């Protein structure tokens, strides 16, 4: 196992003996450097993309990586661009909140998002154009967002957060449902502990910065729809961005009071929520006669593809 690791996190990852080698970088953009690519090539490496890599590198940079990338590196452009993301989700017939074209069109509560994998930092809610402008200006002053940064406005969907993680195997042509998690965001979750009177006096724009994840087990009656959504997404991805949605991905949304799911995001690679199932998820325990984490599942797919000389099916 080779870990491409930011220098600031070296001390942490040196603690784990299963990591055979660390490639230290100041930024994941250095994956493109000849020295890094040479090391990966000499070890016949397959690069596993994650959220920080997507956040730090442009789509063009990711697509120019010469090391084989697990999954579909082309679909990461669709994850990073809000307009393209919405197009793919609609192609997959996922139920979605309506987008709002401009601040002038805000008629109800909306959530305003940044492009790419920002981890929720810089997101904010608004109920009118005036509210939007006030909060945007405040975040610019606080240097959380930049003045020329494009923002995406979407009607706010209320309900129980549920992040649905899947794995699609092109070797077996089969979709697997891995598990569900919830993300805990600061400081929006902490507001519930503050009395309403004090909340009204506060001028601070609440943040949606993701701090951690916790497991969730869905009602069994919801699982059939979960599989259908995952299968529809895989089919849509094959039509829209070849070779499709191979490997891990996540459909993110909420369940309302009628247990109806609304999806507001997707991630086309491994997500942090899979960390809570390092010893296997409840659903994977029904599919595999062994503990199976998402990392182990990816490694198993690479091993099987290598044995059958089909690495081209699982990498780009």
Q: What residues fall within each predicted segment?
A:
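Conserved active-site beta-strand-loop modules that form the wall/rim of enzyme catalytic pockets
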Residues: 173-176, 251-252, 259-265
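A short glycine-rich, hydrophobically flanked beta-strand micro-motif that places a catalytic Asp/Glu
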Residues: 154, 165, 241-258
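A short beta-strand motif that forms the metal-chelation/ATP-contact edge
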Residues: 109-113, 165-166, 259-270
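Cysteine/selenocysteine-centered motifs that mediate thiol-based redox chemistry or coordinate metal-sulfur cofactors
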Residues: 295-316
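ATP-dependent carboxylate/phosphate-activation module, predominantly the ATP-grasp catalytic core
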Residues: 166-237, 267-295, 299
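Short internal beta-strands
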Residues: 1-7
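Conserved N-proximal alpha/beta basic substrate-recognition cap immediately N-terminal to
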Residues: 10-107, 118
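Active-site nucleotide/adenylate-binding loops and adjacent lid/helix of ATP-dependent enzymes
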Residues: 3, 74-160, 167-182, 219-231
């Amino acid at each position: 196992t080779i870990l491409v690791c930011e220098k600031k996190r070296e001390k942490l990852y040196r603690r784990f003996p299963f990591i055979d080698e660390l490639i230290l970088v100041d930024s994941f953009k250095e994956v493109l450097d000849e020295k890094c690519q040479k090391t990966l090539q000499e070890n016949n490496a397959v690069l596993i993309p994650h959220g920080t890599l997507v956040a730090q590198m442009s789509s063009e940079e990711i697509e120019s990586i010469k090391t084989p990338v697990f999954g579909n590196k082309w679909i990461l452009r669709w994850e990073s661009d809000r307009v393209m993301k919405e197009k793919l989700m609609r192609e997959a017939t996922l139920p979605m909140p309506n987008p709002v074209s401009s601040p002038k069109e805000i008629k109800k509560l909306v959530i305003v998002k940044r492009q790419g994998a920002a981890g929720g930092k810089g997101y904010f809610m608004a109920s009118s154009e005036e509210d939007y402008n006030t909060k945007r200006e405040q975040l610019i002053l606080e240097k959380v967002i930049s003045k020329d940064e494009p923002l995406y406005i979407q009607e706010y969907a209320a309900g129980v957060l549920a992040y649905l993680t899947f794995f699609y195997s092109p070797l077996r042509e089969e979709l697997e449902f891995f598990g569900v998690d919830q993300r805990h965001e600061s400081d929006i979750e902490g507001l519930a502990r503050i009395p309403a009177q004090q909340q009204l006096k506060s001028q601070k724009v609440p943040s949606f910065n993701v701090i951690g994840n916790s497991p969730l087990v869905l009602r069994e009656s919801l699982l059939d729809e979960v599989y259908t959504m995952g299968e529809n997404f895989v089919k849509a991805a094959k039509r829209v961005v070849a070779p499709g949605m191979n490997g891990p991905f996540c459909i993110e949304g909420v369940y309302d009071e009628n247990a109806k799911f609304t999806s507001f995001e997707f991630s086309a690679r491994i997500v942090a929520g899979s960390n809570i199932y390092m010893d296997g998820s409840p659903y994977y325990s029904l599919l595999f006669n062994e503990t199976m984490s998402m990392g182990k599942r990816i490694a198993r797919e690479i091993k099987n593809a290598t044995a059958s000389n089909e690495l081209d099916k699982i990498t780009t």
